[in-house]
Amino acid sequence: MYDNLKSLGITNPDEIDRYSLRQEANNDILKIYFQKDKGEFFAKSVKFKYPRQRKTVVADGVGQGYKEVQEISPNLRYVIDELDQICQRDRTEIDLKRKILDDLRHLESVVTNKISEIEADLEKLTRK
């Protein structure tokens, strides 16, 4: 699993926190950030440079003109797909954790209100 990331030398893809991608001249720059260890100010990161793929395409469907376009490297596209899988999974886990915590807070509120209601009923019984 994550063969493209492993081919870049990333041995523990599960430690990836996030990534950024930017274009610089004729290159795409991929920067991968790893989870911070306790006591670290900055996250560890690695940077990779991918040359953009050049293609010559028809400029318009009617004429005979051609133009050169640049696209993201196919290898980089595969790496980004794997990074998206990792980063999306992390977001899903965070969302699930948030939902569980919200459900617990709601349950706590319901139980607290019910206890107060029962105690009030008991108080009414003891006054008689």
Curated annotation (Swiss-Prot):
Pfam families: DUF3461
Transmembrane spans: none
Disulfide bridge positions per record: none
Family indicated by similarity: Belongs to the UPF0325 family.
HAMAP family: UPF0325
Name the UniProt record assigns to this protein: UPF0325 protein KPN78578_01770
UniProt organism field: Klebsiella pneumoniae subsp. pneumoniae (strain ATCC 700721 / MGH 78578)
